[in-house]
C-alpha cells in the first residue's frame, strides 16, 4: 500500500470571472458533471445551497470497484473567492477539499486542493485500495483533480445557450 500525500493542489486558468467560476464549483448538484469520481451530490438536512454548515450527500465511484457515499459539510462559502467542504467520519478520517479563485490577467486562476486533516484508519485504506484497485491514490486524485478543473474551465468558457 503506497502512502498517500497529505495535501495536493492543482490549478488552471479560466477565461471567466471569479464569480462565474464560484457559481459552478459551489453548485454541488453539478459535481457529477465535473468530477470523474464524484458521480452525484444533493443537499441534505434542509440545506438548499452553499453556506457554512450546509451538508450534502456525495456518491462516488472510482473507475473500478463499488460506489460509496459520504456526507460532507461546507466549511467556507465565500463567493468569488473560495468554496470548501470537509468530509469526515469514524474510520475514514477527515479531508478538507478547497476550490480557490483569484482574479488573473486571463480571468480567474482556479485551484483545487485537498488536505488530509486526519488520516483514515489503515484498515480502511487497505480495503479502499483493494476495492478500487488503485495502487497510487495520490496520482489518481491528482489526475481526477486536473480533469475536474478542465471540465469546469470548459463549462465556464462556453456561452450559455
Predicted regions and their residues:
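Hydrophobic ligand-binding cavity/cleft-lining segments
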Residues: 1-47, 51-52, 148
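Short, surface-exposed coil-to-beta transition loops
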Residues: 7-9, 67-71, 93-97
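A short, structured loop/turn motif at beta-sheet edges
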Residues: 18-19, 48-50, 75-80, 100-109, ...
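Hydrophobic pocket/interface hotspot
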Residues: 20-25, 31, 56-58, 74, ...
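Short, highly charged C-terminal tails/helix-capping segments
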Residues: 43, 148-161
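Short beta-strand segments that buttress and anchor functional surface loops
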Residues: 54-62, 83-90
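Short, cysteine-centered beta-strand-loop-beta hairpins and adjacent loop/turn segments enriched
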Residues: 62-68, 118-122
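Beta-strand/loop substructures that line and gate deep hydrophobic ligand-binding cavities in soluble
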Residues: 89-143, 152-154
Amino acid at each position: 500500500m503506497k502512502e498517500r500525500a497529505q495535501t495536493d493542489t492543482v490549478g488552471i486558468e479560466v477565461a471567466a470571472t471569479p464569480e462565474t467560476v464560484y457559481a459552478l464549483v459551489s453548485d454541488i448538484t453539478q459535481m457529477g458533471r465535473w468530477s470523474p469520481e464524484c458521480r452525484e451530490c444533493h443537499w441534505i438536512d434542509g440545506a438548499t445551497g452553499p453556506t457554512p454548515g450546509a451538508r450534502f450527500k456525495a456518491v462516488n465511484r472510482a473507475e473500478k470497484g463499488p460506489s460509496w457515499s459520504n456526507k460532507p459539510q461546507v466549511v467556507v462559502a465565500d463567493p468569488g473567492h473560495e468554496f470548501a467542504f470537509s468530509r469526515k467520519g469514524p474510520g475514514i478520517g477527515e479531508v478538507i477539499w478547497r476550490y480557490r479563485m483569484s482574479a488573473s490577467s486571463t480571468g480567474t486562476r482556479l485551484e483545487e486542493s485537498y488536505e488530509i486533516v486526519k488520516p483514515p484508519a489503515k484498515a480502511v485504506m487497505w480495503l479502499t485500495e483493494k476495492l478500487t484497485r488503485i495502487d497510487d491514490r495520490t496520482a489518481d486524485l491528482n489526475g481526477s483533480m486536473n480533469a475536474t478543473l478542465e471540465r469546469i474551465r470548459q463549462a465556464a468558457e462556453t456561452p450559455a445557450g
